Amino acid sequence: MVKTVDDLQPGETAIIKKHSVSGTLGKHLREMGLINGIPVKLERRAPLGYPVEIKIQGFSLALRKEEAKAIELE
């Protein structure tokens, strides 16, 4: 089973293995530091579960469900 950002619990940290977000959004995520080998921490989930807030390289980023499920972790 592949672990994704969607599987993390608040406060949990993991290392990015890869992501399958394509197109312009994928490019923006890579530019913001979502690249292989970088640690990512799940800060919190919205009351209904999405979006999720992650902390990566010192800044916070909100991800939709589809994006969180597309980021695979080690």
Q: Where would I find each of the regions flagged by the language model?
A:
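Compact, glycine-rich, soluble single-domain proteins
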Residues: M1-E74
